[in-house]
Amino acid sequence: MRYLVTAALFALLLLPGRSSGVERSRYFLRLQDTLLRAQDSLVAKTADSLAVNDTVPALDSAAQAALADSLRRQHVYDSLDHIFWTQIDTTTLPCFDSLSVAWADSIAQFLPDTHDIKRLVRKMRKEERDSLKAAKPRVMETWVLPDSMYFRRILVWTSDKKFNEPTLGGLDTTANSNYNEYPMYKKDVGASYLGPVGSATQYFNYFKREEVPDAPMFTPYIGDSYTDENIPQYNTKTPYTELAYWGTPFANKKSEESNLKLISTQNITPSFNFTLGYQRLGSRGMLTNEDTDHRTTMIIGNYMGKRYFANFGTIRQRIVRNENGGVQDAFWIRDTSVEAKSIEVNLTSASNTYKRRQWFIHQTLAVPMNFFRKDRDSLALGEGTMAHLGHSGEFTTYSKVYADAIGTDDTFGRAFYHNQFYLDQTTSSDELMVRNFENRFFIKLQPFAPDAILAKINAGIGYQILATYSFQPLDYLTGRRYDTQHNLYVYGGASGQLKKYLAWDADADYYYAGYKMFDFDINGKLRLSVYPFDGGIHLTGKVHTGLQTPHPFEQQLYMNHHQWKNDFSKVSKSTLEAELSIPKWRLDAAFGYALVTNMLYYDTLAVIRQHDAPVNVMSVSLHKDFTLWRLHFDNRVLLQLSSAPEVLPLPKAAVNLRWYFDLDVVKDVMNVQIGVNAVANTRWYAPAFSPDIGQFHLQTSEKYGNIPYCDIFANVQWKRASIFLKYTNAFYDSWDRPQYFSAYHYIKPVSGIKFGIHWPFYTW
């Protein structure tokens, strides 16, 4: 500090206008010498001046005093003044002007003070900091990821709400990934759905069916949207944008399908990312009165710092759908070639509006516990003994509004609901609402290292406020009333790994107070990996067991077409799953077994029931891509068995075969796949759908299956853009009795041309 102040003072003394007293004296002497030389050039009158001898005699003190007095006399000053001013002419004026300018420009006006010195010191310090900041690269530093991943151009992950643990994923923008325009076909071999894209869906594979425990009416729609636990989070070095469109732009406006997806993500700093997303799935449908508009909007962000890691955002899901209840008679689909729009449907004036709004945050603060280490400053981020303090918060609102108008002379409409009209004989307006406010606080201890065999020990506590609303007759007197449940629970877990060969984790929840008292959930996972070749062989095992209290809507409901009041027991569910993955061979296999006691289901009248006997489910699936020269045989097969098909019907077999010829039109520029895609399943009692409660339910009237649904396609990878062109349901007229039903009395899209493009934009 002393040397810095000295340097600043020295710099101030050298600056123009900041000269020292010594320097100022030097300037004054130069000016005086110049003035004297200018005055010596003036001619003095002899009479007014003293005669000066060539030799000056020595004077005594009296003579010196007399001389001094003579010089001080007024007439001497007046004489010199007269001489000076009378001798100024145009040649001497520029001399005075230049001298005055030089003096004003070069002579210090004032000396530097303490404030000047401090100001210069601050300036020098700022310049030093700016130079260091400019020289330092902007690199993400975090304990969440190993330093080998800091320099990846883009990172994608999801985080769980229990412990805010990130699960890294990939970003696949290839033509193979974007070929399936229906989200359900990306996750499963097949599914039951209501025809248009974005409508209610139920997967064939029992082990891939998703649920919304807090709002059961959203279960058929959650697979086409995002939640706080499966929404992708990004960290990218340069801005990244995805634009996608797929649909039937050449179809009739009455049955047009139009889908859109937009994602734009950018890092504001190396640690902070901001993402905007929008997705629209929808179609006017093949039948009358089945317009579907399914939209999801996302505003999310994340911060991945040295000690702080957070994922946060808001998700808005909205579905507006006209409900037709399916065709009145399947004869018009199987045995005729009548235009689909002219076929009569069960409901002519019915609709559903679903809304879900979710705000969430998952955050963790890392605290290194190395207080007694002398070299703790050199300790790598995330290494050694650490504690992680975390919080997970969520506020979600769900709503469903169903409305219909069924006249007294509408035979098919009234028969569709089995002539059940409890509140009004002609119109319905039923509303279901749920509000979920939940907070979790947890601590994660890292005893040794993030890659140790015992890497983390976790514990937490949670509090949930669940408010539900459904109409009750008492509301006529009291108005709308929410039924509120409070739930308190504790949870914990542990995880670890052994290099890259073994990884394990386990967690458990237990509700000790509230509506869900004595509910529990236990999960375990073990992954073994060996590497005899590139990509390795990976075997994963999962185990789950739990006890769950039925939702308030499952216990009691009062609507115009359905009502019940139950006292169901807790549902017990245990599963065992195994997965095998060999990337080099493009092979994936899975096995699943489930045992469910007190299973809930909806009977043929769409009334909820509880099965009093255990139900066993077994499933085997295989995905293998065979290659023969340029021919690809991409096959997915699913086999399933249910011990109680009268309660849980499942297709015994389902396949998805995509066979194509792969051709490089221009190497590393354009690749084209030309082939056929077929989906099929064995005959089974496909479920029916009840629009007012928003649930799939049993039907035993008719079986569907054994007829493949085929698309002829051209799939193109043109640099970054992936483009497909399909002729859907190409063999619609090739079968004697086509049964292209997606669910009971709901049909799949008929023949038509579909076009899609997916284009990512980025620079790296």
Cite the ranges covered by each PLM segment.
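Hydrophobic h-region of N-terminal signal peptides that target proteins for export
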Residues: 9-17
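Exposed, low-structure sequence patches enriched in small/polar residues
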Residues: 236-238, 243, 349-411, 416-764
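Short periplasmic/luminal acceptor-recognition loop of GT-C membrane glycosyltransferases, typified by
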Residues: 2, 22, 650
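Positively charged n-region of N-terminal signal peptides that target proteins for export
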Residues: 1-4, 276
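Generic early N-terminus positional signal peaking at residue ~5-7
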Residues: 5-6, 26, 619, 634
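Membrane-proximal, glycine/serine-rich, low-complexity loop/turn segments characteristic
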Residues: 21-357, 366-382, 527, 531, ...
